């Protein structure tokens, strides 16, 4: 289980392999940092946008993880379990294209997680001399980490909500997002987003009070309390 402040916040965790980084507004864009492969399909795509002013090359690295988080254990995926195409993309400034992911793993009731790292590489190596006398790149390599969730092929979406105790539990075998907005007139920035994996439980005082509380599953909003008029927020 992990939490994100602000229900519409999609802050990228960027690893810049250079001390002289370009503005983040002029870098790779991949949309939501968590994306899912639905239980009824074996294919999902991810759009990559080159927001730079010059061409870039994009590559992918994939690791299987036991569970997303700071203490996750990364391993090499089983050969043939998760494939992607193409091997790399070359995009001019402003262009976009899709990487496609194909799942050929077990068709059971277990959810699987993968760390997908998108690597943005300049097509030319421009350097600038640093104050110490060395050279640094003026167009850095950028790595953006995302999480691909392969939902169980035998999926069970189940949850429970106890307003008395302020508790939401994931009693199924696949993840969903919980949006908690205190009060009926609170803004998106005042809310919280919780990502619940199977077995996760969230205890929050706000869940005992009136507010706009939703589950988001497969891009669908599910209102879990009737204390406020229905007004679905953004799923980002």
From Swiss-Prot:
Keywords: Chaperone, Fimbrium biogenesis, Signal. Transmembrane segments: none annotated. InterPro entries: Ig-like_fold (IPR013783), PapD-like_sf (IPR008962). Residues 1-27 form the signal peptide. Induction: Negatively regulated by H-NS. Positively regulated by IHF and EcpR. Disruption phenotype: Mutants do not express ECP and are defective in biofilm formation. Belongs to the EcpB/EcpE family. Part of the ecpRABCDE operon, which encodes the E.coli common pilus (ECP). ECP is found in both commensal and pathogenic strains and plays a dual role in early-stage biofilm development and host cell recognition. This is Probable fimbrial chaperone EcpE. The lineage of its organism: Bacteria, Pseudomonadati, Pseudomonadota, Gammaproteobacteria, Enterobacterales. The gene is ecpE.
